[in-house]
Each structure stands twice: as structure tokens, then as C-alpha cells.
A protein has these predicted regions:
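Generic hydrophobic, helix-prone segments enriched in Leu/Val/Ile
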Residues: 35-38, 61, 73, 77, ...
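Short metal-binding segments enriched for Cys and/or His
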Residues: 47-74, 129-156
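Short recognition patches in nucleic-acid-associated and regulatory proteins
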Residues: 15-48, 68, 97-130
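Long compositionally biased, domain-poor regions of proteins
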Residues: 52-56, 60, 101, 108, ...
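Short, intrinsically disordered terminal segments enriched in charged and Pro/Gly residues
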Residues: 1-13, 63-97, 146-183
Length: 183
């Protein structure tokens, strides 16, 4: 992976790879076989929110989501992101840019989106392809948020409030009504 590709999933604050899981504090280098998600939200070219979370913590949080939300997310990603079609089209290319150049759900070019989020699954310094990496524009993120149950929104709000400096309602710059992207 070239340095430009790596930088998509490095911390915008430090310019370096994320070191720890935001939820449990595990060093992301401690277990080289444990994948982790990097999620970053941008307003224009400015990264306004970012985190890395290990697969254990990500899976545990997802299990807490209501059945209704889990089904809504699965339906959204199956119908709107068209995972199989995306996989067949992009899998042969092990380059990040084709995967994130446009919104995975509505095809809006990333360069034209007022806000967007990037998500990538990494194993050490290596990006894991299919279905990630992906880009979601702010409009599609808002649509996803509207599909979630109050229970799931509460779990996500608790995650944000626990791990970031201000409560979710105070994230004024975020495109999706005060909540960062749920990737």
C-alpha cells in the first residue's frame, strides 16, 4: 500500500497509524491477527471526527443494537450499497481510491459531497478489502441514522459520549444531526 493510501486511514491529528482501540484501549499492534475499523468523518477536506475500534469491541457493540436496527442496516447495505456487485467490480483492484472515490450507496463523488465518512478495516498496517474500504456521503449517513431504533441510537450516543470530549448533541459540525458516522 502506498503512503497516500495509508494516509486515508491514519489519524488526521497525528498523521500516523492509530495505536489503540478507542473502546477498550487495546494496542492495535498487540494482536496482529485482530482486525480493526478506522472511521473518519469529513466536512469538506477537514477531518472532524475519527476513531479506531478493534473487532471485538465493534462486534460487541453491534450485538447490542436492536434486532430492528440490525435488519435495517443489513437491508440498507444489501439494497443500496449492492455489496455483491461492488465486490465483483472492485475486488480485482487492490487500490483504495476506486473503493472510496464515491459514496457506496448513492454514487455521489466524494469530491462533490459536502460531508462524508470513510471506513476501512485494517489488520496491522494492511487494509482488508471487501466490503471495505467505503465512503458514505452525509445524506446517506443521515438516511442510515433515520433507520435506527431509539435503543440503537442510545447505544451509539453512549459510545460517543464515553469516548469523545463532548456529548453527541454538541457535535455541531457533524453532518448527521449531531451523530458521527455509524460504519
Amino acid at each position: 500500500m502506498d503512503s497516500k493510501s495509508q494516509s486515508y486511514f491514519h489519524s488526521s491529528e497525528t498523521g500516523k497509524p492509530f495505536e489503540d482501540c478507542i473502546s477498550c484501549g487495546l494496542s492495535l499492534k498487540e494482536d496482529p491477527d485482530l482486525p480493526f475499523l478506522v472511521a473518519k468523518t469529513f466536512q469538506g477536506d477537514e477531518c472532524i471526527f475519527e476513531y479506531a475500534i478493534c473487532e471485538h469491541c465493534r462486534a460487541n457493540m453491534a450485538q447490542e443494537f436492536s434486532d430492528e436496527s440490525q435488519q435495517a442496516l443489513a437491508t440498507f447495505f444489501t439494497q443500496r450499497v449492492r455489496l455483491e456487485e461492488r465486490s465483483q467490480l472492485l475486488s480485482p483492484a487492490k487500490l483504495i481510491e476506486p473503493w472510496i472515490q464515491q459514496c457506496a450507496a448513492c454514487d455521489t463523488p466524494r469530491s462533490k459531497a459536502k460531508s462524508y465518512s470513510l471506513g476501512g478495516i485494517l489488520l496491522g498496517d494492511t487494509i482488508i478489502y471487501d466490503p471495505y474500504p467505503l465512503c458514505l456521503c452525509g445524506d446517506c449517513e443521515e438516511e442510515i441514522q433515520s433507520l435506527l431504533s431509539q435503543q440503537t441510537l442510545g447505544i451509539w450516543d453512549d459510545f460517543v459520549q464515553t469516548n469523545f470530549d463532548c456529548p453527541p448533541g454538541q457535535h455541531q459540525d457533524l453532518p448527521n444531526k449531531g451523530r458521527p458516522a455509524l460504519l
